[in-house]
Amino acid sequence: MRIGIGNTAYLRDDNDDAGFARMRAHGYTSMNYDMADTALPLYGDAPAALERRMRAFRERAESHGITVDQTHGPWRWPPQDATEEQRTERFEKMCTALRATALLGAKCCVIHPVMPFGCDKDPAPERLWAINGAFFSRLSAEAERCGVAIGLENMPMPALSLARPAEILRLVREIGSAGLKICLDTGHCLVTGQQPGDAVRPIGRDLLAALHVHDNDGTGDFHRWPFTGKADWADFSAALGEIGFSGPLMLETSLRFFGHVPADCAEPLQIALSRIARHIADAAESG
């Protein structure tokens, strides 16, 4: 199993050859390309400019032996999904992210559920479900046209009725599109009271398109390194092996979540993190 990490963990910008080289030297051959920030220039690109930008990044990554296997679609904090106009604007940016995902050669664009009532309340669960059902039915059709899949992500928001892996799985099955699968976030599982391995098994190989791997103590989405929180990593690896997961083990943590690290200490810690990822991935393959 390959291991991966987000572009921002190593790269200062899209042209950072030294960052690519260091990433590859530390054992990573897979990458998540982050498009969460809706102010990124790519969202203002004309189609030809977007193609040039994404193809240039893909070629640079591949020249270093790294493939972009997944991306992260647009996201605003706090959520801005309350009105039809806001959801339409978000939909358009997500379509851009799906096209960019295809141009990068990735197969999955990770996207969060729509949160029309915010992230800490759910006064109308049926309305929340209907909005998301309509939204992702349309968006998954666009994903199919692009030749990619949405990885609908479980959320660390216990108040929402569309946050837990089982709820995400139910929506994905109801829509039933080849363009809609699941990204399982291990840290988010813990915040909603579930061990990641217990979430992996019901999803299964066919619908588990991507991973976000990190840890916490169950009280908040802290993006800590694996083995520093409450996740049962042996069981998580076992579950991945049981379902035959074939994607990369993608970290969603880095030195940024470790604290302010002196420059001369950074690389040994980066290597340590990559070895942790390698341990989890190897355990999944051997189990």
Task: List each model region and its residues.
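Histidine-acidic metal/acid-base catalytic patches
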Residues: 1-4, 12-29, 62, 137, ...
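Active-site beta-loop-alpha junctions enriched in small/polar residues
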Residues: 6-10, 34-38, 73-76, 114-116, ...
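Accessory recognition modules or surfaces
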Residues: 9, 43-45, 49-53, 259-269
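Glycine-rich, proline-tolerant flexible connector loops at the mouths of alpha/beta enzymes
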Residues: 32-57, 119
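A short acidic, helix-capping loop that chelates divalent metal ions and anchors anionic groups
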Residues: 39-44, 77-82, 117-122, 192, ...
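Short glycine-enriched, charge-decorated loop/helix-capping segments at active-site entrances
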Residues: 43-48, 84-87, 125-127, 223-228
